[in-house]
Curated annotation (Swiss-Prot):
Signal sequence range: none
Known EC number: 6.1.1.9
Top-level taxonomy: Bacteria, Pseudomonadati, Pseudomonadota, Gammaproteobacteria, Lysobacterales
GO cellular component: cytosol
Main location: cytoplasm
Protein name (Swiss-Prot/TrEMBL): Valine--tRNA ligase
Motif annotated as 'KMSKS' region, chain positions: 551-555
NCBIfam families hit by this protein: PRK05729.1 (NF004349), valS (TIGR00422)
Task of the protein: Catalyzes the attachment of valine to tRNA(Val). As ValRS can inadvertently accommodate and process structurally similar amino acids such as threonine, to avoid such errors, it has a 'posttransfer' editing activity that hydrolyzes mischarged Thr-tRNA(Val) in a tRNA-dependent manner.
InterPro entries assigned: aa-tRNA-synth_I_CS, aa-tRNA-synth_Ia, Anticodon_Ia_Val, M/V/L/I-tRNA-synth_anticd-bd, Rossmann-like_a/b/a_fold, tRNA-bd_arm, tRNAsynth_Ia_anticodon-bd, Val-tRNA_synth_C_sf
Binding-site positions, ATP: K554
Length: 942
């Protein structure tokens, strides 16, 4: 075994340790014990590891390692998603950069898909390599790609079954259409933002010589206009769509227009007659109370159109130019050119009543930035009503638990307002829909293969069948992830991969932003297709933001690459990474300036453990999580402190060979074992509640404060003392507690704990070859009758802290011996002083400890109070009296402030506060009063 390095350098061992773990097969399921399964939300195969991935994967890995150490049969199922649209865009962009003139369309379907597979082979494992660097202990031999044969077979099976159940149908519906990508996209891929626009008011002439009395009133209800009109005024932000209007509507209870319901208006620029209909959707108080209805180009109008059986006129081509349904003079115009032409004609006709500035929500595709068009096309859909009803039941009856539970309300709202799901996409990369059309008749057949279709429907070789060209949207295959990865529907594969053993999984860790698009659909699909729940718990994480609370994005130039935090990056490389390939070149200078200001020296290497511990510490149950680099620096220091503490332990136990549980001889040993038992119980509770932030906090406090700051100090008198038995016992306890601490920390910080444990294990006679196979600590391992020792050592700590504070404030050199005089106090204080005199003398550098006799005057001294006990450090030869007066005044002010806080807290307590809490605060207040009296008395003497 090589000697532990003198300084903490994570780069020197993290990669080697990971390779050793993986080579030894430690990440594979053991096949014994209770199963514990986690599904990785499959990242896009196009992607690289970002902070959101690192955040979720750290928490998943902590749970997997924790349960593996507890003897569970752990399976962490990983893989990647084919990411239809994103992948097509990346490959198309790469083709353009190659400069060979090849495009998606010039290559054709098969040629382009071949290029996609080539690209996938080159870069598809990038994100998995990055996950390894983070320390994820997944079973890589089971890694699955959603386009692999097995999950592809599952996709076909699910489609066919749902089609046969009547859940999948083909029909015309409105979808979100991206005119650049020329495909439908999901709601998740649409980003709406407020933009400046216009609201145009247009006169629609009433048919058949109809008229009505139009009245306008001001805010006070005073009539300002009364006239007879033979036209209705409608307002729109999209005047070009009036060419596709099939009605105008009013509220059924609007008396102004009651006699016009069922009549017609003449549609401007077309001469078509469209009806005046009544619908509750209309807001009578907005504008004139008359609304145009364009069912093929507005989602709300579509619903109105369905209710009233209105014609649906699609005006646009797939690239958002006007098609043959528009008047000939507008055909072929881009939608924005058509808008200008329509407005010009309306103005020439004198029926453009008003134009005014208007704020409106504009939906844009998240990948192209283009305005999304509500578009009427033939698409494949899944009927959602019955699936959603069952999906909601499984959460509301507790079969599946949400953490935090408030997300149930969001889930319920969506499930109660669900729409049929458009599952087809006009792409080439993805799972091609298993449907075939008869070239002669247009009849559609669905089956697992063309051969199955022909056999089932008795179609001879003379019948020409063409497969549907559309592919399924990515979420269709993703919803099958819980069971397609376990071999479904192939029975042999299901048996080999442990379908019955590992489904349902134990917990899903994912972002709340895909609760509808993925979580809900997995619940519905798993229940319907295999009769199980997909997972028992869902833990929703917040979204990672930068230190100022801003969303991390390439365009903002504030993205942090987790690998840069782990391995470090120079400032020039960081600037290049943040500014390269920006869609808005004008942002380059601004981003470079901000980056150089925030990271003047680049980002130092922190190691994987420091990043992982930072993530755990930040993992609150809130919606947003601010990532603060200062926290990462702090936890790097934590790792460094743990390293140095381990070096201390190893240097003081050279040649040691212990076995079993130590039998503590000193109070310091008993105290640290009691703290260890309490910390272990607390840690297990936090794991069970998914409170990673509190877990990190309690382990940090034990490691830094209890173990490093106090136990190592308190062990020094025994290690350096004359009592050989005390020294030997302390050495055993030192190693024993450190080994337990490494086990406690291992799920969060696997690398440093493994590296240190390898040095420690031989001295404790441990048989395991790796820390990852050691059992996670239980509180019962460390419990004992240590209550008195705990109280005694807490008193000792208070005395040491008080005297050290005095020495520090007096600027007494650390090596200088000083006397300590004691006054007042209880009998218990005298017993403890006697008991701990050697430790006090050693740790406080005291040349003498003496009690003042009752009634004896105290010399001029710096004073501190612990309970009833007054601690006096005589000032003669140490300090001038003026400085001590200043010090005492500051100490009195501090204690007065604490006393006031305690009094305020007691005054605010209500009847609902537990009596024990009230009593605890009263005791605290009494202690402050005692300290204050002693300090004032000492000040009076000076």
């Amino acid at each position: 075994m090589t000697q532990l390095a003198s300084s903490y350098d994570p780069k020197s061992f993290e990669t080697d340790l990971y390779e050793a773990w993986e080579k030894a097969g430690h990440f594979k399921p053991s096949g014994t014990g209770e199963p514990y399964t986690i599904l990785l939300p499959p990242p896009n195969v196009t992607g690289t590891l970002h902070m959101g991935h690192a955040f979720q994967q750290t928490l998943m890995d902590a749970l997997v390692r924790y349960h593996r150490m507890r003897g569970y049969d752990t399976l962490w199922q990983v893989g990647t998603d084919h990411a239809g649209i994103a992948t097509e865009m990346v490959v198309s962009r790469n083709l353009a950069l190659e400069g060979k003139g090849e495009t998606r369309d010039s290559l054709g379907r098969e040629g382009f898909i071949g290029k996609v597979w080539e690209w996938k082979q080159q870069s598809g494992d990038t994100i998995e390599r990055q996950m390894r660097r983070l320390g994820t202990s997944a079973d890589w031999s089971r890694s699955t790609f959603t386009m692999d044969p097995q999950p592809s077979a599952a996709v076909n099976e699910a489609f066919v079954r749902w089609y046969e159940q009547g859940l999948i149908y083909r029909g015309q519906r409105l979808v979100n259409w991206d005119p650049v990508l020329k495909t439908a996209i999901s709601d998740l891929e649409v980003e709406s933002a407020e933009e400046d626009g216009f609201l145009w008011s247009i006169a629609y002439t009433l048919d058949e010589g109809l008229s009505y009395e139009h009245v306008e009133r001001d805010a006070d209800g005073v009539e300002t206009l009364r006239e007879t009109r033979d036209y209705l005024v409608v307002a729109t932000t999209r005047p070009e769509t009036l060419l596709g209007d099939t009605a105008v509507m009013v509220h059924p209870e609007d008396k102004r227009y009651a006699h016009l319901i069922g009549k017609s208006v003449v549609l401007p620029l077309t001469g078509r007659r469209v009806p005046v209909i009544a619908d509750d959707y209309v807001d009578r108080a907005f504008g004139t109370g008359v609304v145009k209805v364009t069912p093929a180009h507005d989602f709300n109008d579509y619903e109105v159109g369905v209710r009233h059986s209105l014609p649906m006129i699609n005006l646009f081509t797939p690239v958002a130019a006007l098609n043959e349904n528009a008047p000939e003079r507008f055909q072929g115009l881009d939608r924005y050119a058509a808008r200008k032409a329509v407005l010009a004609e309306l103005e020439d006709l004198g029926i453009l009543v008003e134009t005014k500035a208007h704020k409106l929500q504009v939906p844009r595709g998240d990948r192209t930035g283009q305005v999304i068009e509500p578009y009427l096309t033939d698409q494949w859909f899944v009927k959602m009503d019955d699936l959603a009803k069952r999906g909601l039941e499984l959460v509301e009856d507790g079969s599946i638990s949400f953490v935090p539970p408030n997300w149930i309300n969001t889930y319920r709202h969506w499930m109660n307002n669900i729409q049929d799901w458009c599952i087809s996409r006009q792409l080439w990369w993805g799972h091609r829909i298993p449907a075939w059309f008869d070239e002669a008749t247009g009849s559609c057949y669905v089956g697992r293969s063309e051969e199955e279709v022909r056999a089932k429907h008795n179609l001879g070789s003379d019948v020409v069948l063409n497969q549907e060209s559309d592919v399924l949207e990515t979420w269709f295959s993703s919803q099958l992830w819980p069971f397609s990865t376990l071999g479904w529907p192939n029975e042999q594969a299901m048996a080999e991969r442990g379908f019955d053993r590992y489904l349902p999984s134990s917990v899903l860790i994912t972002g709340f932003d895909i609760i509808f698009f993925w979580v809900a659909r997995m619940i519905m699909a798993t229940d319907n297709l295999v009769g199980k729940i997909p997972f028992k718990d869902v833990y929703f994480t917040g979204l990672i933001r930068d230190g100022q609370g801003q969303k991390m994005s390439k365009s903002k130039g504030n993205v942090l690459d987790p690998l840069d935090i782990i391995d470090g990056i120079t400032i020039d490389d960081l600037v290049a990474k943040r500014t390269g390939g920006l869609m808005q070149p004008k942002m380059v200078e601004k981003i470079e300036k901000a980056t150089r200001k925030e990271f003047p020296d680049g980002i130092a290497a922190h190691g994987a453990d420091a990043l992982r511990f930072t993530i755990a510490a930040l993992a609150t149950h809130g919606r947003d999580i601010k990532f603060d680099m200062n926290r990462a620096e702090g936890y790097k220091n934590f790792c460094n402190k743990l390293w140095n503490a381990s070096r201390f332990a190893l240097m003081n136990t050279e040649g040691a060979a212990f076995t079993g549980v130590p039998r503590p001889r000193t109070d310091a040993e008993r105290w640290i074992l009691a703290r260890l038992a309490a910390t272990t119980a607390e840690a297990q509770g936090h794991f069970a509640a998914y409170r990673f932030d509190l877990l990190a906090q309690c382990l940090y406090e034990f490691a830094w404060n209890a173990f490093c700051d106090w136990f190592l100090e308190l062990s020094k008198p025994a290690l350096n003392g004359a009592d050989a038995a005390d020294a030997e016992s302390t050495r055993h306890t030192l190693l024993y507690v450190l080994e337990a601490l490494l086990r406690l920390l291992h799920p969060l910080t696997p690398f440093i704990t493994e590296q240190l444990w390898q040095q420690l294990a031989p001295r404790l006679g441990l048989a395991e070859t790796t820390l990852s196979l050691r059992p996670y600590p239980t509180a019962a391992e460390f419990e004992g009758d240590f209550a008195q020792a705990e109280a005694d050592v807490e008193w000792l700590k208070a005395v040491i802290s008080a005297v050290r504070r005095v020495r520090s404030e007096l600027n007494v050199a650390p090596s200088k011996l000083v006397p300590l005089r004691l006054q007042a106090g209880l009998e218990q204080d005298r017993v403890r002083i006697e008991r701990f005199s050697a430790s006090l003398s050693f740790l406080l550098k005291l040349d003498s400890i003496q009690w003042l006799a009752e009634g004896e005057s105290a010399p001029p001294a710096a004073a501190a109070i612990v309970g009833e006990l007054k601690l006096l450090v005589p000032l003669e030869g140490l300090v001038d009296l003026d400085a001590e007066r200043v010090r005492l005044d500051k100490e009195i002010a501090r204690v007065e402030a604490e006393k006031e806080k305690s009094e305020t807290k007691l005054a605010k307590f209500t009847d609902k506060v537990p009596p024990a809490v009230v009593e605890q605060e009263r005791v605290r207040l009494a202690d402050w009063n005692t300290q204050l009296a002693g300090l004032r008395e000492q000040r009076a003497k000076l």
